């Protein structure tokens, strides 16, 4: 049986080495996120200040995988 994951939204606050990011979730928790393979292959740029969807394990809520970058309202892309 596959492990169930929680999907949360958050704001990237800090960029760390090796494609890792510090993400402040909407419930005010801090999480360490890494970029998923599909985002990496598609050359999607993730920067501090971006809103993202992050997939967090039920067992370790301090780490997660960034699975989607949400569009900003003020950007043209």
UniProtKB/Swiss-Prot annotation:
Its main location: plastid. SUPFAM superfamilies: Nucleic acid-binding proteins (SSF50249). Gene3D superfamilies: Nucleic acid-binding proteins (2.40.50.140). GO terms for cellular component: chloroplast; cytosol. Residues 1-71 form the S1-like domain. Pfam families: eIF-1a. Coiled coil: none annotated. HAMAP family: IF_1. Component of the 30S ribosomal translation pre-initiation complex which assembles on the 30S ribosome in the order IF-2 and IF-3, IF-1 and N-formylmethionyl-tRNA(fMet); mRNA recruitment can occur at any time during PIC assembly. One of the essential components for the initiation of protein synthesis. Stabilizes the binding of IF-2 and IF-3 on the 30S subunit to which N-formylmethionyl-tRNA(fMet) subsequently binds. Helps modulate mRNA selection, yielding the 30S pre-initiation complex (PIC). Upon addition of the 50S ribosomal subunit IF-1, IF-2 and IF-3 are released leaving the mature 70S translation initiation complex. This is Translation initiation factor IF-1, chloroplastic. It comes from Cornus mas.
């Amino acid at each position: 049986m596959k492990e169930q994951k929680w999907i949360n939204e958050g704001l990237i606050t800090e960029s760390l080495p090796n494609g890792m990011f510090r993400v402040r979730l909407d419930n005010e928790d801090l999480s360490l996120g890494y970029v998923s393979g599909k985002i990496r292959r598609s050359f999607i740029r993730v920067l501090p200040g971006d809103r993202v969807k992050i997939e967090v394990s039920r067992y370790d809520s301090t780490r997660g995988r960034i699975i989607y970058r949400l569009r900003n309202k003020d950007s043209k892309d």
